[in-house]
From Swiss-Prot:
One of its GO terms (cellular component) is cytoplasm. The keyword Hydrolase does not apply. Pfam families: HMG_box. Coiled coil: none annotated. PANTHER family: SEX-DETERMINING REGION Y PROTEIN (PTHR10270:SF161), SOX TRANSCRIPTION FACTOR (PTHR10270). It comes from Hylobates lar. Belongs to the SRY family. Transcriptional regulator that controls a genetic switch in male development. It is necessary and sufficient for initiating male sex determination by directing the development of supporting cell precursors (pre-Sertoli cells) as Sertoli rather than granulosa cells. Involved in different aspects of gene regulation including promoter activation or repression. Binds to the DNA consensus sequence 5'-[AT]AACAA[AT]-3'. SRY HMG box recognizes DNA by partial intercalation in the minor groove and promotes DNA bending. Also involved in pre-mRNA splicing. Residues 187-196 have a biased composition (Polar residues). Keywords: Acetylation, Activator, Calmodulin-binding, Cytoplasm, Differentiation, DNA-binding, Nucleus, Repressor, Sexual differentiation, Transcription, Transcription regulation. Residues 60-128 bind DNA. One of its GO terms (molecular function) is RNA polymerase II cis-regulatory region sequence-specific DNA binding. This is Sex-determining region Y protein. It is found in: Nucleus speckle; Cytoplasm; Nucleus.
Amino acid sequence: MQSYASAMLSVFNSDYYSPAVQQNTPALRRSSSFICTESCNSKYPCETGENSKVSVQDRVKRPMNAFIVWSRDQRRKMALENPKMRNSEISKQLGYRWKMLTEAEKWPFFQEAQKLQAMHREKYPNYKYRPRRKAKMLQKSCSLLPADSASVLCSKVQLDNRLYRDDCTKATHSRMEHQLGHLPPINTASSPQQQDHYSHSTKL
């Protein structure tokens, strides 16, 4: 039960899913076993033992680097000055401004980042950054969702893939028909020499 609580904390950040509540709620215990048996696949097994520790570690945020330390206040300031500017555009502007700073101007933020990294190492001595691939994140999200939601999400992805393949097949077929329609007509009438050759072959 404790291992399941560790797994569910990665999805639901609420006290309702604490181990004590699970032990006192029979319905929740039944739903937990249902989700674990129906949603988890062989590629992403249910997290127990060592796997639960990895799940806890994945939730730990990386320490901020110098750019993130500098851009926190700059991003907030730019968003207030340009309320209609999209976040992606703000990020581009911040990246450009950071490159334009001198090493002396960047140095205080590097020092602050080093302090934060030292505090992070002290708090999480066994932390190792593990980047996730987007495709694996999608499959893992299916395994962590309730069975009904996971099946609907995964079915939608499969349906979109089938529709894409069908559209490609239809486009190829219509393109072939268009090319065949522009070919010169085949003359089925045979010449007199061909007819004589055919009649001679028949007599033989």
